[in-house]
Amino acid sequence: VAEGRAVVFISHKLNEVMAISDRIVVLRGGQVVAQRHTAETSTRELANLMVGRALLEDIDKKQLEPGRPVLEIQALDALNDKKLPALKNLNLVVRQNEILGMAGISGNGQRELSEILFGLRDPTRGVIKINNTPLKFGSPSAAIKLKMARIPEDRMDTGLLMDLSVEENLILEDHASAEFQTWGLMKSKRIHRTSDELISAYSIATTGRDAVTRSLSGGNLQKVMLARELAGKPAVVIASQPTRGLDVGAMEYIHQRILQERERGAGILLISEDLDEVFALSDRIVVIYEGEIMGEAAGENASREQIGIWMSGVNLKVKQ
């Protein structure tokens, strides 16, 4: 710009758009729906224009009494891909009707913890229990049988099979169940009906159940994964970076679905690098640093200053 050039900056990250632009054009559905001078608009107005409706001002999170423990992690140790310690004596408890938010800078053991919970990595020590039943490590199917829903951070790599149809992804974890199969023969009508119901219930924008999953937008890919994982009414939900790379409308939708699971009675472990998300959704917040829990705070009493100090690796309690 300083050299006299014009710059077109394309992004759905509204804070960045507001910080560097002089004029803003909003696209929705392939059409220009609004133009604004940056000084004369706000992130709230732009967000509403992007989704074509008024977004909720605040997340409506009901006060709920946490129930019994549904996820217990005890003395968990693990190595990273370089065979260096990634998790060190990690202990966590998640209860019914509760969202436990895990904050931390990327690369402090979050990915390794997610992979262990998803059955993709073995720890070197420790026990994980779901509803008081020990989890068999290295077995994704074991986690599914114990009613754990898994929302991995990379929906295109570990969350979905991109070259399969939407329908195939929706029934992926249950395709061999009695609901969808008899004597090796697929129950096509039942599968079609279930897929159509999930597409409708989760507002998945697609040309149909036979559409190739790769053709969907990021927000709709996340909805497919949510529909598959939450359809079975899980006892535990592991949500790892659930809104990464999504626009504001999709983020709001995902947040509402997570809160609905909390109200239904599930225990949710929310692993996120987005502090706004952690503060908005969590009943309790823990901070992970170099594979260890630095501190814990109740969601309503947590301060950004305290969480930030713990995220930097300083074990210091801020005076309220």
Regions found by a protein language model. Give the residues of each.
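Glycine-rich phosphate-binding loops of nucleotide-dependent enzymes
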Residues: 1-320
